[in-house]
Curated annotation (Swiss-Prot):
GO terms for molecular function: ATP binding; dTMP kinase activity. PROSITE patterns: THYMIDYLATE_KINASE (PS01331). It comes from Synechococcus sp. (strain CC9311). InterPro entries: P-loop_NTPase, Thymidylate_kin-like_dom, Thymidylate_kin_CS, Thymidylate_kinase. It holds the Pfam family Thymidylate_kin. This is Thymidylate kinase. PANTHER family: THYMIDYLATE KINASE, UMP-CMP KINASE 2, MITOCHONDRIAL. The gene is tmk. One of its GO terms (cellular component) is cytosol.
């Protein structure tokens, strides 16, 4: 079996940039078996179906915004397809998968942010993932003010436009899960390369534990 690595965090935390850094470093790190490939993916939108769901979730037509429960179920559908068509087959081939978001984002945004029932979300996680859990999740932790500053004047999607109070609840959710789910926390309000090196060091440490 391969390995599933996940980057989590609020919008503007630098996930996309760090995903690119990690995807360049990993194949040369010596951590991956020679025969393994690296599959880089994201949620929502890691499959053809997921791409359509992403558009519906983040940029819906006028007057077609999904309600909170519908939103939760659409994210679960995206994840179920993602696990079934991309992640699980890759792991079974012995490949490594690097994903921009996974189950933690649903708990943070829909559980903490929207205030939906967290036990229900946990049950949906189990169904959508068929019990699959990441080998390592990295939470990129940044102050909310920096998140807002980094996003600047770019066009916001439907979730990003929810406002500061929503983002505060989401950030609290990520913090709680980092403690409860054995995630790795990386302070991300530093220069790009410092953050990348911190992630690499954390991964080397975790990989050493896998060998024990």
């Amino acid at each position: 079996m391969g390995r599933l690595l996940v980057l989590e965090g609020i919008d503007g935390c630098g996930k996309t940039t760090q995903l690119q850094q990690l995807s360049s470093w990993l194949p040369k790190s010596g951590l991956m078996p020679d025969e393994s490939r690296l599959v880089v993916t994201r949620e929502p939108g890691g499959t053809a179906l997921g791409t359509s769901l992403r558009q519906l979730l983040l940029h819906p037509p006028q007057d077609a915004d999904p309600g909170p429960t519908a939103e939760l179920l659409l994210y679960a559908a995206d994840r179920a397809q993602h696990v079934d068509r991309v992640i699980q087959p890759a792991l079974e081939r012995g490949d490594w998968v690097l994903s921009d978001r996974f189950t933690g984002s649903t708990m943070a945004y829909q559980g903490y942010g929207r205030g939906l029932n967290r036990e229900l979300i946990t049950d949906l996680e189990r169904i959508a993932t068929r019990g699959l859990t990441p080998d390592m999740t990295v939470w990129l932790d940044i102050p909310l003010a920096l998140s807002v500053q980094r996003r600047g004047s770019r066009e916001e999607d439907r979730i990003e436009a929810e406002g500061l109070a929503f983002l505060e609840r989401v950030s609290e959710g990520f913090s709680d899960m980092c403690k409860a789910r054995d995630w790795v926390s990386v302070v991300a309000d530093r220069p790009l390369l410092e953050v990348a090196e911190a992630i690499q060091t954390a991964l080397l440490t975790r990989a050493a534990a896998w060998q024990r």
